[in-house]
Amino acid sequence: MKKYLKVVYLIFISTAAFAQSTPKYSNEFLNIGVGAKAFGMGNATIASCDDVTSGYWNPAGLVSLKDNIQLSFMHSAYLAGIANYDYGAFATKLDDRRALGVSIIRFSVDGIPNTLDLVRNGQIDYNRVTSFSASDYAFLLSYAQKTVVEGLTLGGNVKVIHRKAGQFTTAWGFGIDAGAQYKTKNKWQFGVMARDITSTFNAWKFSFTDAEKDVFTQTQNEIPKNSLEITLPQFILGAGKLFEVNNLIGFRAEVNTLINTDGQRNVLVSSKYFNLDPNLGIEADYKKAVFIRAGVGKFQRELDINNQKVITLQPNIGIGLKLGSLMLDYALTDIGDVSASLYSNMFSVRFSINKRETAK
């Protein structure tokens, strides 16, 4: 046991030391989240996720699919429509012990002005201003399986990342995630998710014409060079419980804690070695067909108008409606504009095919 603890300690210390020389917020678009159901609960879903979105949140949850096949889609807009965020996923049960999933995530900003050729020979010509898009893509292949331990499931992701900014730069990356869930007979649920467990990398390649390089030089800007970007591991711990009031009404509550290892961040518990960012959520359902959700997260320390330190947070609410094989979810984030973030409307749809027969 002592040897095991020493190994864990060395891993954390090594990661923390490496964090001092690696950028924070690498591949940050992968931390936004997917599914309006999860957003409505403040993204506290690591321990309880049991549908197609588990491929993103915790692949171990794919084993708990209640259907042979599930499809899910989500679209949302950020910054008054400047940025678009899209998600699509497919999951299927291979048998009673194994499941497979595929997820695609896209975050894009379109219509970015390219002003490198705005000034030529001292003359400004707006007709030479063009536009380009900056897009980030992630492709996740997920696998989950039950273990010999009753209630314990394991899962993992292999993910490929592609990022592009116009004709100027492209990047390809590769990473691995691993997750586990444990559910007890008295309806307690526990989960752990290790993202970028092998330190995901992005290999960036830049391409500029000689004329564009001259503009960088004349404006005293550094010309970007091909480089390798590393995303350090992050860990999410979750615990929750199901409550059944009667045959009609049920409740679910969960709390998660995100642990970052890429250096000090502005979160509730912050240090140069690791950071703790908690979030929690609740869900009430009626006949497993109508759902009401609420959650809170993104705790940050900020200075108010009086230059006093305060803690801000982001409250979310959501609803869900199940219509046969169709599940509709909606979430409104940052209710009352409590945090510095702008509120967003989230819509997602889930479609089930070939519902499995359950024993009575």
Which positions does each model-derived feature cover?
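Sec/Tat signal peptide C-region and signal peptidase I cleavage site
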Residues: 15-19
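Subset of outer-membrane beta-barrel
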Residues: 20-360
